[in-house]
């Protein structure tokens, strides 16, 4: 066709189309003008709307995220601005069918920190690898760390739908909240005295509620388990027992932390998070321990710098369960707030507050991670438990809990009766008077609150005062019973009836407690430089390292140090034992007279057992002098000795005293009391074999001490003294008593055990230990290594490896049975 014809045809077509368009316009305009919607074009529904259409949806909307429940499944509507941002999630027990195995308010696994990232078409959940301390790393080192310590991908989620504007993504999160998750242990493996195994019934899992707030959201889920439980792992107390629990899962954003990490010092007892550092000036890595502590910043920094007490910008706030009996609430408050005195030593006024559970605050939820609570558990356990949860990046504590069980009164009565009934007539009954109950409850709360603040128990404190000082009314009024309430001591059990006015309860913060809080919570305006803080803190501890009342020591797994004992008191274990056993004998002789309204003798049985255990504890404390090595964390710059062996004469005195007491141990029993039918089997008789074992277990301690000091009490001298005491009656032509016969059998067994030629065994040290201590020690001893701190102040460097306060500082040895 000719080109001109084609052009004409195209023009005609365009004119025709335009005419049609113009022709349609008036009709459309007319329709709109008269409100006729029948001809509107229906907008296509977006995918987000379609996803929820015609479904039964329960929704909780908040400023942070939105939660949906559809057919028993939980959906998280996450704003895409949070992709790549760190979040935190944890699980708390909300209700239970059996508080003996599952406590309301407890968290049986630490909260997890994670983030969601979009990768291809899925959303990946990643756990930050926070094991490496990366502050101040050079760019080259930072790149190497990123390659070798990358974040872990733990789970993937296929997006259900995005909002139309892509501002949020909807994820099905059943794997985190309604299914068994590796991140959250719901039923603990240990609860009080019970060892527990459990299996979950997935068909009996129900979503009970959703909540969404400005800064967090939560899902409440009912779960059902089959539980097996045993007492101390021996006696089965539950088999395939059904257990129902409601669990609240909380998710919240983790803001970029401005908390300054504080490097732990092994000489000050703080809980820690372990990390690894790669300092530029070292050719190897070193451990870093970040102390756990709440972040406190003074409101008025200028006043604080001048030494004036200042309130913190954000206080440590605890909410008190309204379920507590009215008579419990005041002593609980006092017990918590007692720590404000210690915070004043760090420059803060009113650092801690205790508030009632709010009645009209819709944001408040005691099962929410954002709230720290003191919970009441009405069950048979006789204890107080505590926990805190930290930011793994910095060690900052963001939440804490105290759990107080209903039967704690029974524990307090037992401890106070055994500890003070010899000197305090008020205690001589089946229950504590109200005033003493409140005093005891307040003391226990204060002691447990230390753990919530990040502190560790200090088992060295109770041996700091002399035994005689603890009998002085003036001294104990001014200084308390120990330099730290964090020791295991509760009552002044060595006080005698003649010690008028002496303090009987360990309810006073000591000088160590004030020192420890000052170390952990003092604010330094050093521009957020943890290395500069560490330098200052190391110097402060160095200056006071020789003060005996500030000594800290962690719990011993194997008893080596006689000054670090659970429930010891005073610096002379033998004198303390003699005074205490005098009190125990007096209490035992009056037990039936003082404990009335006890028709089945259950209370008397329990107290009688506690008396026997009290005797045994005193023997063990005195026994710890034999082969005893006093251990102390020290830096090279302080020149303090790490190990000091108990003087030889004192060791031998203690061993001979122990042997005399052991042979007469059965004589302490009240046979008339036992024959009345209260006791099925004598507790004193039951402990005899334990005593024999304890006596022979002293060998390893003596080997350790001999390695530290070759001139100390030796293994040969130990066996000579043991032989003379064991066979004294036989040598004198007398019949040995039951305990002596047990000791003789054990001695013969040990004498021939492991010998090459039993006929060469001689009285005294067994043949298998001939040549000890040197040869025996050389083969069997294994001294633990302790951190040999480099001098952090040299060259202006700070050694981040300030030590782990919970690590053992005690030497160990193994001896053949």
Q: How would you label these PLM feature ranges?
A:
Residues 385, 390, 396-404, 445-453, ...:
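Extended catalytic-interface subdomain
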Residues 29-324, 342, 357-412, 416-432, ...:
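Auxiliary tRNA-acceptor-end handling modules of aminoacyl-tRNA synthetases
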Residues 16-26:
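C-terminal segment of classical bacterial N-terminal signal peptides
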């Amino acid at each position: 066709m000719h080109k001109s014809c084609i052009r004409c045809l195209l023009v005609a077509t365009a004119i025709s189309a335009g005419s049609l368009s113009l022709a349609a316009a008036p009709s459309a305009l007319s329709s709109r003008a008269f409100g006729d919607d029948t001809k509107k074009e229906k907008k296509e529904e977006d995918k987000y709307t379609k996803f929820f259409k015609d479904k039964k949806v329960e929704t909780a909307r908040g400023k942070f995220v939105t939660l949906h429940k559809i057919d028993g499944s939980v959906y998280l509507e996450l704003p895409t601005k949070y992709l790549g941002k760190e979040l935190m999630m944890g699980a708390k027990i909300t209700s239970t069918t059996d508080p003996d195995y599952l406590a309301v308010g407890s968290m049986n696994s630490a909260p997890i920190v994670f983030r969601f990232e979009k990768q291809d078409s899925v959303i990946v959940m990643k756990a930050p690898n926070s094991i490496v301390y990366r502050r101040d790393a050079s760019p080259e080192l930072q790149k190497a760390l990123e390659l070798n310590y990358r974040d872990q991908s733990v789970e993937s989620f296929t997006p259900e739908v995005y909002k139309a504007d892509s501002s949020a993504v909807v994820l099905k999160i059943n794997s985190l909240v309604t299914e068994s998750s590796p991140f959250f242990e719901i039923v603990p493996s240990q609860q009080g005295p019970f060892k527990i195994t459990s299996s979950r019934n997935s068909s009996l899992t129900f979503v009970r509620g959703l909540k969404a707030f400005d800064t967090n959201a939560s899902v409440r889920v009912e779960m059902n388990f089959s539980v097996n439980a045993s007492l101390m792992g021996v006696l089965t107390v539950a088999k395939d027992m059904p257990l129902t629990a409601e669990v609240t899962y909380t998710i919240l954003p983790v803001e970029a932390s401005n908390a300054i990490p504080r490097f732990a010092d092994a000489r000050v007892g703080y809980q820690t998070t372990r990390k690894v550092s790669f300092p530029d000036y070292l050719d190897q890595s070193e451990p870093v321990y970040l102390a756990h502590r709440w972040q406190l910043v003074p409101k008025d920094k200028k006043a604080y710098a001048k030494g004036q007490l200042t309130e913190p910008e954000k206080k440590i706030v605890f909410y008190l369960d309204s379920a507590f009996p009215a008579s419990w609430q005041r002593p609980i408050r006092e017990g918590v707030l007692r720590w404000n005195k210690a915070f004043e030593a760090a420059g803060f006024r009113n650092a801690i507050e205790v508030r009632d559970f709010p009645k009209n605050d819709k944001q408040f939820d005691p099962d929410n991670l954002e709230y720290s609570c003191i919970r009441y558990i009405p069950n048979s356990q006789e204890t107080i438990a505590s926990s805190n949860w930290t930011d793994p990046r910095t060690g900052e504590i963001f939440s804490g809990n105290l759990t107080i069980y209903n039967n704690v009164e029974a524990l307090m009565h037992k401890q106070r009766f055994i500890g003070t009934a010899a000197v305090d007539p008020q205690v001589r009954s089946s229950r504590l008077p109200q005033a003493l109950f409140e005093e005891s409850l307040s003391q226990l709360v204060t002691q447990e609150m230390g753990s919530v603040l990040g502190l560790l128990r200090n088992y060295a404190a109770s041996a700091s005062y002399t035994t005689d000082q603890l009998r002085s009314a003036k001294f104990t009024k001014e200084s308390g019973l120990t330099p730290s309430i964090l020791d295991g001591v509760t009552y002044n059990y060595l006080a005698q009836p003649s010690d008028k006015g002496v303090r009987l309860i360990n309810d006073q913060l000591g000088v160590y407690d004030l020192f420890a809080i000052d170390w952990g919570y003092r604010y330094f305006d050093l521009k957020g430089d943890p290395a500069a803080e560490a330098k200052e803190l190391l110097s402060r501890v160095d200056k006071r390292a020789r003060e005996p009342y500030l000594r800290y020591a962690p719990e011993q797994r194997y008893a080596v140090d006689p000054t670090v004992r659970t429930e010891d008191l005073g610096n002379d274990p033998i004198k303390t034992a003699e005074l205490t056993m005098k009190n125990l004998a007096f209490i035992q002789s009056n037990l039936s007279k003082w404990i009335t309204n006890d028709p089945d003798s259950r209370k008397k049985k329990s107290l009688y057992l506690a008396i026997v255990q009290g005797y045994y504890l005193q023997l063990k404390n005195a026994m710890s002098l034999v082969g005893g090595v006093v251990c102390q964390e020290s830096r090279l710059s302080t020149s303090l000795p790490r190990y000091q062996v108990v003087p030889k004469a004192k060791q031998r005195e203690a061993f001979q005293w122990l042997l005399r007491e052991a042979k007469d141990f059965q004589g302490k029993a009240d046979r008339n009391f036992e024959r009345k039918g209260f006791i099925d089997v004598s507790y004193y008789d039951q402990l005899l074999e334990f005593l024999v074992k304890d006596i022979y277990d002293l060998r390893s301690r003596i080997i350790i001490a001999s390695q530290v000091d070759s001139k100390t009490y030796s293994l040969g001298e130990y066996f000579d003294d043991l032989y003379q005491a064991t066979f004294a009656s036989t040598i004198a032509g007398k019949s040995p008593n039951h305990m002596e016969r047990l000791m003789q059998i054990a001695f013969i067994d040990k004498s021939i055990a492991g010998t090459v030629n039993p006929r060469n065994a001689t009285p005294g040290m067994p043949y298998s230990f001939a040549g000890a201590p040197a040869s025996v020690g050389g083969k069997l001893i294994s001294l633990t290594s302790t951190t040999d701190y480099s001098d952090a102040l040299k060259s202006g460097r700070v050694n981040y490896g300030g030590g782990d306060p919970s690590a053992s500082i005690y030497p160990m040895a193994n001896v053949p049975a």
